[in-house]
Regions:
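Glycine-rich phosphate-binding loops of nucleotide-dependent enzymes
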Residues: 1-156
Length: 156
């Protein structure tokens, strides 16, 4: 399935069976291909044959195009090259600036401190603290990661 077919997965419920609108998904696929610089010969190229970074761009672009009020990502850049990682980070930051609640699950403290407003820290499957990313540091977050109830967490 190419990018256009992949875009149609999100609009299938809105369609009318065999009379599904194919122009909107094609236009969206073209826009994502160009704006996110997806490296593929065409929007009909099978997504499953693309590199991991390009697949990630297609999926994140498709979800953002739905104009969600909440966008949740888990390890959004795991295994991606640095350029693609920054593309994804920039997309998430743009969404945050538009008022979308972005829930970012990750483990790179530098990235979390840069991207997030608040950080919910887990330890042993339990919340050990909630900190303001603008006023905390890696040492405080690290302390919260190692023991439940420890550290001087500010409830944000």
């Amino acid at each position: 399935m190419g990018m256009t077919g992949n875009m149609m997965l999100r609009s299938w419920r809105k369609g009318k069976g065999v009379f599904l609108n194919r122009k909107d998904p094609e236009a969206l696929a073209q826009r994502i291909w160009q704006e996110l610089e997806v490296v593929t010969p065409s929007t009909n190229f099978p997504v499953r044959r693309m590199s991991g970074g390009n697949v990630q761009k297609v999926l994140v672009g498709r979800e953002i195009a739905q104009q969600p009020s909440v966008l949740m990502t888990a390890y959004a850049v795991r295994g991606l090259d640095i350029n693609t990682s920054y593309t994804i980070y920039n997309l998430l930051t743009e969404q945050k600036m538009k008022g979308v609640a972005v829930v970012y699950v990750g483990e790179d403290l530098d990235v979390l401190l840069e991207l997030c407003d608040r950080i919910v820290v887990l330890c042993g499957g339990q919340v050990s603290g909630v900190v303001d990313a603008r006023t905390t540091n890696k040492l405080e977050v690290g302390a919260l990661m190692t023991r439940v109830g420890g550290g001087a967490a500010e409830n944000a």
